């Protein structure tokens, strides 16, 4: 590797840290520290160096039966929830909790915080339920927050069914995964957040547009709000 590329590689490594960041976010952070480096050069070194988002290995859980998605005919029949991670300009990690109604692809809410343990997950869901009503089922992956005793007790007390996807089968949560991709491209990777408040502000603005203005092919080219009307 040429000497100049080694310098770029070291600059990339210095901003990657241990938190999840997309390629575009990496490029922006490198350029913030090294304004003289062009985006195309950083991208080339990034790709040639084989940088990728690493996966954490968790303790193996007993698997559950296949759980394919069935699109509901009414709202509040099944929600899907999932986490995402990003990083502030200062380097501190943030997390988001995304809640989607499978019926009309509406995003019921996005909680943005430094950490989102099961307690905060429950608080976020209770705020959404207060505004939109209670779902029959909630679909999740096998994350520790969802498998926790606190979250499982809350589901039972509220008579909400838990629809857990199989480990290693993200396609069983394809609707929220597709939403996550859009949110990452439009918001997380497109911006450098100066603070938690900044991330929340941009997320709130984008969320309104997503629900009220963005047309969805799967909804006959209607917005989520219009489809549910």
Regions found by a protein language model. Give the residues of each.
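Two-metal-ion RNase H-like nuclease active-site motif
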Residues: 77-86
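Active-site beta-loop-alpha junctions of metal-dependent nucleic acid enzymes
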Residues: 88, 92, 110-132
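RNase H-like polynucleotidyl transferase catalytic core
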Residues: 138-142, 157-175, 191-196
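C-terminal domain-tail junction helix/linker
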Residues: 158-160, 181-229
């Amino acid at each position: 590797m040429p000497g100049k590329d080694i310098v770029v590689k070291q600059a990339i490594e210095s901003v990657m840290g241990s938190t999840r960041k997309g390629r575009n976010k990496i490029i922006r952070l490198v350029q913030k520290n090294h304004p003289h480096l062009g985006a195309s050069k950083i991208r080339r070194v990034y790709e040639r160096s084989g940088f990728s988002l690493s996966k954490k290995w968790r303790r193996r859980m007993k698997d559950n039966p296949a759980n394919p998605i069935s699109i509901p005919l009414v709202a509040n029949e099944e929600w899907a929830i999932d986490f995402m991670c990003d990083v502030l300009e200062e380097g501190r990690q943030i997390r988001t909790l995304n809640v989607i109604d499978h019926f009309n692809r509406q995003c019921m809410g996005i909680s943005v915080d430094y950490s989102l343990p099961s307690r905060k997950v429950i608080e976020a869901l209770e705020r959404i339920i207060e505004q939109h009503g209670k779902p029959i089922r909630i679909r999740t992956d096998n994350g520790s927050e969802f498998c926790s005793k606190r979250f499982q007790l809350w589901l039972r007390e509220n008579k909400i069914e838990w629809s857990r996807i199989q480990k290693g089968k993200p396609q069983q949560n394809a609707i929220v995964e597709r939403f996550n991709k859009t949110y990452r491209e439009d918001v997380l990777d497109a911006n450098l957040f100066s603070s938690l408040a900044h991330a929340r502000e941009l997320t709130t603005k984008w969320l309104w547009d997503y629900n009220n203005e963005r047309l969805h092919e799967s909804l006959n080219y209607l917005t989520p709000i219009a489809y549910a009307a």
